[in-house]
Amino acid sequence: MIRLEGRAVIYGEVWFDEEPPPPAHAGVDIIEYRCRPNPIPNARTATLLSLQTDLTAPPEAIVGGFHGGCRYLVRRAEAKDGLRHEVIRDAGDCLDEFADFYDGFARQKALWLADRHWLSRVAVEGQLVLSCAWRGSKPLVWHAHLRSGRTVRLAYSASCFRGMESGYRSLVGRANRWLHWHDMLHFKEAGLECYDWGGVFADESTPERAGINQFKRMFGGQRVVHYECTVPATPRGRLWLALRERRRAWHPPRPVPALRQGA
């Protein structure tokens, strides 16, 4: 369980099929069940759409599910761009480097900055996996994943190429697709079974949201519905949730990491 200190309470996040420890041993006020396959009875529940790629399939079947244009760009990057794939074994050692890179990307696109507290807590629990596509000594794209059981979920994706010339933008676009592909290969070799694309937007009314969804669909994942469930674990947590609901009626919440990404 990932423990997160809030303003007045301690949250505990459990992902996918994870179960929290018994309340007497959890040490948290509120339990957040993330990406559950089924809703938790009597919980505050919201739905979240996502896409998932089956990593138990052979590599040729996985890449064969990519849309043709995506598959072409991955193969071109493999053959001509001189990219290097790096997976950071101890994510905590490179957390600031990743977050600084992401924040530069986020400022270009007017997105929320990286949630360093969340990232650091995930790293402490050994569930954070960082990866990077390099060309020479220059990082082109960074990804951050959350690992839970046999599933790995994309949490952040960042590439900084806005304002650059078109050839460089095309290179970074290929590198991003290539990095996703090599991330999947890495996780498959590590014995994971499912690559979750970190959510898709139900509302595609803006070009930005439609573009992110379209990018993820290029990889041919299967559409799934997740449930985000919130359960108080202490009287303090129950009171705080009631106050939080009143506050959110006036101020929209900060988005969960699932959708803090860009294509």
Locations of the language-model features?
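Intrinsically disordered, low-complexity, positively biased terminal segments
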Residues: M1-P39, L154, A158-C160, L171-W178, ...
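A conserved beta-strand-loop-helix scaffold within acyl/acetyltransferase catalytic domains
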Residues: I2-L4, R34-A46, T53, P58-Y168
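Active-site/acyl-donor-binding loops of N-acyltransferases
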Residues: I2-V14, P37-A61, E193-A263
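Surface-exposed alpha-helical segments enriched in charged/polar residues
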Residues: P20-P23, R75, S120, W181, ...
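Short glycine/proline-enriched coil/turn segments at helix->beta-strand junctions
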Residues: H25-V28, E125-L128, E189-G191
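A structural micro-motif
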Residues: V28, D81-L83, E193
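Short, surface-exposed, polar/charged, turn-prone segments marking secondary-structure boundaries
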Residues: E78-G82, W112-R116, F161, W181-D183, ...
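Aromatic (often tryptophan-rich) hydrophobic motifs at membrane interfaces
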Residues: V129-A233
